[in-house]
């Protein structure tokens, strides 16, 4: 069960990079529909479209890196549930 969850999480993360690279407009629309808050959408856009590291995103948003990880994980879990 845990192994399946990790694999699903990793595959979603991997394909988000590919989608963001090939179809940036589609990625923006997907994040707009999936993310409840503007902050979640901003984090995902910075991570996948602008290819920023979590530490750089945390500095830009003036928050802790763990908070960025938590929000990122929540959004990916929402995508998995779709």
Residue ranges and their predicted role:
Residues 44-45, 76:
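Hydrophobic residues on short alpha-helical segments
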Residues 41-42, 66:
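Short, solvent-exposed positions on alpha-helices
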Residues 61-82:
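DNA-recognition helix of helix-turn-helix
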Residues 1-33, 55-56, 62, 81:
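N-terminal interaction/assembly modules
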Residues 33-41:
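Short helix-coil-helix linker/hinge
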Residues 43-44, 57-58:
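Hydrophobic positions on the alpha-helical face of helix-turn-helix-like DNA-binding modules
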Residues 45-52:
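Short helix-capping/turn signature of helix-turn-helix
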């Amino acid at each position: 069960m845990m192994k399946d969850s990790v694999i699903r999480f990793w595959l979603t993360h991997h394909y988000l990079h590919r989608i963001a690279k090939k179809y940036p407009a589609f990625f923006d629309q997907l994040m707009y529909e999936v993310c409840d808050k503007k902050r979640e959408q901003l984090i995902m856009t910075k991570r996948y479209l602008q290819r920023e590291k979590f530490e750089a995103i945390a500095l830009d948003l003036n928050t802790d890196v763990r908070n960025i990880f938590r929000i990122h994980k929540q959004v990916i879990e929402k995508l998995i549930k779709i």
